[in-house]
Amino acid sequence: MLPDGLSAEDEQRCRQLLARTTARLRSRPAAAAVLVPLCLVRGVPALLYTLRSSRLVGRHKGEVSFPGGKCDPDDQDVIHTALRETQEELGLEVPKEHVWGVLQPVYDREKATIVPVLANVGPLDLQSLRPNLEEVDEVFEMSLAHLLQTQNQGYTHFCQGGHFSYTLPVFLHGPHRVWGLTAVITELTLKLLAPGFYQPSLAVPELPRG
């Protein structure tokens, strides 16, 4: 039987596992932070995603992402950044006590640090959200059960200069394909929530050394 990922036991276990990373990273400088929203949609445990507006400037427009953005000098820490950006993008207020902790950071092509913040936002009616249409085209969920099914998992191989460079996870057969760093963060989350059920064959890439 698949775990629901949102039980009191799951929360306690995840908070304990994330405590050290949270203490180490929450106040460390970072380029950006994103919220990884655990939620219940029609009673089903899920992760909440956004489709970035096609009107945005830059290479990430129209991509699937978690709510989040650049750290502001006035932000107290990366948790504050993630919660502020979620409110600005979705009109969703997430109390700080609903945050379970900080996940392992990921890095973009420019080696900028992006810190994922895991929180349980509870039961959610997507129709009640007020997305900022300048930043978000769509809000959708993918259930944990869907994400944990092997037929919905894959990998994308990237090449640079005609040579194999790196491989990242991809999650398929939902409203939109989840790939790139959003898929990496999804993989980190599934490894934490369901270690006995999600066992990827690919290690999450780390910041290149040197």
Swiss-Prot record:
Swiss-Prot/TrEMBL catalytic activity: an acyl-CoA + H2O = an acyl-4'-phosphopantetheine + adenosine 3',5'-bisphosphate + 2 H(+); CoA + H2O = (R)-4'-phosphopantetheine + adenosine 3',5'-bisphosphate + 2 H(+); acetyl-CoA + H2O = S-acetyl-4'-phosphopantetheine + adenosine 3',5'-bisphosphate + 2 H(+); butanoyl-CoA + H2O = S-butanoyl-4'-phosphopantetheine + adenosine 3',5'-bisphosphate + 2 H(+)
Main subcellular location of this protein, as a coarse class: mitochondrion
Keywords tagged on the record: Hydrolase, Magnesium, Manganese, Metal-binding, Mitochondrion
Any single GO CC term annotated in Swiss-Prot or TrEMBL for this entry: mitochondrial matrix
Enzyme Commission number: 3.6.1.-, 3.6.1.77
Cell compartments where the protein resides: Mitochondrion
Residue numbers of N6-succinyllysine PTMs: 70, 96
Motif Nudix box, residue numbers: 70-91
GO molecular function: coenzyme A diphosphatase activity; magnesium ion binding; manganese ion binding
Pfam family of the protein (one): NUDIX
Statement: the UniProt record of this protein carries the keyword Calcium: no
Highest taxon, organism lineage: Eukaryota
Summary of the tissues where the protein is detected: Expressed at the highest levels in the kidneys, heart, brown adipose tissue and liver (at protein level). Expressed at lower levels in the brain, skeletal muscle, and white adipose tissue (at protein level).
Top EC class, one word: hydrolase
SUPFAM superfamilies: Nudix
UniProt record, GO biological process: acetyl-CoA catabolic process; butyryl-CoA catabolic process; coenzyme A catabolic process; malonyl-CoA catabolic process; medium-chain fatty-acyl-CoA catabolic process; propionyl-CoA catabolic process; succinyl-CoA catabolic process
Domain Nudix hydrolase: 25-172
Residues bound to Mg(2+): 85, 89
Needed cofactors: Mg(2+); Mn(2+)
Its biological purpose: Acyl-CoA diphosphatase that mediates the hydrolysis of a wide range of CoA and CoA esters yielding 3',5'-ADP and the corresponding 4'-phosphopantetheine derivative as products. Hydrolyzes short- and medium-chain acyl-CoAs, exhibiting the highest activity toward free CoA, hexanoyl-CoA, and octanoyl-CoA and the lowest activity against acetyl-CoA. Exhibits decapping activity towards dpCoA-capped RNAs in vitro.
Protein name: Mitochondrial coenzyme A diphosphatase NUDT8
Record organism: Mus musculus (Mouse)
Gene name of the encoded protein: Nudt8
